[in-house]
């Protein structure tokens, strides 16, 4: 794939983007993580109670109007256009009511799809549906321990009122991300920074989409892609423009240099 490639992810998506940046090293020129679900064991999924929240969340309503009213109440802080899109795409008519003008509706994504983000569905392997110990997904904690292996500049974009990106969490993210020097090329600099969107919570991209988009665009345009175009991209072009003969000659000279150093 042609660089630069920018990774952007929110919440669990931020954790997944960060994980991809480590498992597929240098796939991203930069990444922007919006309130990512990344943290040490004491901030892991087992401590957040997300499974309980999912089980309590309503998934069916008698009419589409009832569903819309409930969603507008639950997500009243969201930008109106974003909320309209949520309502448009997140509910559908139940099979028995498709032919009716109005009738029961359900969430497009049920509880199971959300629960497996938080708790491992161990019954898939064991076949034992009940009676097993609950095991929470470890992705956010795993990624926390891999933050030092990140190989691209990173922006943490956080909600000022978020209960996930607390000052302590942000301090850990900034201090640990891309910290391991052995994974850097000589002279390589990686920028790790944060931006805070005031008066927003964990759902900051849904609450203030324009402000989030402006911050992301500014980071990409003025900072990271400019750095990539001026340095990394230029270096790659120098190599690509060489003939095969010159590439081979450079490799041989490099080998001779190593022999004098090693």
Swiss-Prot record:
Disruption phenotype: Abolishes the production of ACT-toxin and impairs the formation of lesions on leaves sprayed with conidia. Does not affect growth rate of cultures, sporulation, and spore germination. One of its GO terms (cellular component) is peroxisome. GO terms for molecular function: hydrolase activity. Keywords: Hydrolase, Peroxisome, Virulence. Its EC number is 3.1.1.-. The keyword Hydrolase applies. Pathway: Mycotoxin biosynthesis. It is found in: Peroxisome. A motif (Peroxisomal targeting signal type 1) lies at residues 260-262. It comes from the Eukaryota. InterPro entries: AB_hydrolase_1, AB_hydrolase_fold. Induction: Expression is positively regulated by CSN5 during infection. The keyword Hydrolase applies. Belongs to the AB hydrolase superfamily. AKT2 hydrolase family. Gene clusters encoding host-selective toxins (HSTs) are localized on conditionally dispensable chromosomes (CDCs), also called supernumerary chromosomes, where they are present in multiple copies. The CDCs are not essential for saprophytic growth but controls host-selective pathogenicity. Although conventional disruption of ACTT2 could not be accomplished due to the high number of the copies identified in the genome, the high sequence identity among these copies of ACTT2 is likely an advantage for RNA silencing, because it allows knockdown of all copies of this gene simultaneously. Abhydrolase domain-containing protein; part of the gene clusters that mediate the biosynthesis of the host-selective toxins (HSTs) ACT-toxins responsible for brown spot of tangerine disease by the tangerine pathotype which affects tangerines and mandarins. ACT-toxins consist of three moieties, 9,10-epoxy-8-hydroxy-9-methyl-decatrienoic acid (EDA), valine and a polyketide. ACT-toxin I is toxic to both citrus and pear; toxin II the 5''-deoxy derivative of ACT-toxin I, is highly toxic to pear and slightly toxic to citrus. This is Abhydrolase domain-containing protein ACTT2-2. It comes from Alternaria alternata (Alternaria rot fungus). The lineage of its organism: Eukaryota, Fungi, Dikarya, Ascomycota, Pezizomycotina.
